[in-house]
Amino acid sequence: MERMPAISLAAVPGRRSATLDLAVEIEKKGFTGIYCPSLGDSMALSQAIALVTKEILFGTSIMPIYFRQVFDHASSASFIHETSKGRFRFGIGVSHGPALKAKGLEGGKPLSDIRSFVSELKEAPRVGELPPIILAAMRKKMIALAGEIGNGMVFANAARSHMQESLDVLSASTKKDANFFIGNMIPTCISEDVEAAKAVNRKTLTSYAMLPNYRNYWKEAGYVEEMEAIEKAIEAKEFDRIPHF
């Protein structure tokens, strides 16, 4: 049997209990992991998953560092780590400007903020043992930082054609470390109608293409022409053209 992928799982109001039932089913089906995006409360969902599952690995992917105080993050992460018997991975990131603005928050400098957060997290007193810390990374400086201070990293929508170049910034020892986690969240639509599936994914990726961080990554990955065309469409408020690119 081929290795099963991990699944992204979010809990929305009114369906939280059903989501936990689904987590149990995901484990029974043999999937390799459950990762909770920043949609909703990924820490609360992870805490519940720790208690309803037995063996599957799971984690946040990601928990924005600005949403809570560092000590609160450390306490919750340690609790989940302990109650899951080490199955939890604490994925963190800076999120995106529009998402922070919607919550009345303002981000800072991604690299220095992540470095400070991880340092303070590890120094938090009397919280207990911490889980592996996974950094959300897209571009090379954050990837290098993950290799320096983290236990892994997670991409989102990363191009396979650019992956080798991205990973080349890691040290040889980090690349060989089986405990260093490398993940890539990929929106997936399964259908016998290939064109319909493509249309769904284009619609899904449109929201990512609206964000500067992703466009900058895709430019680095070689899609300069497409990203510049999208930027022109955004500037002209011709949003319906974005899926075309």
Label the model's feature ranges.
Residues 1-245:
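Active-site-adjacent structural elements that line small-molecule/cofactor binding pockets in enzymes
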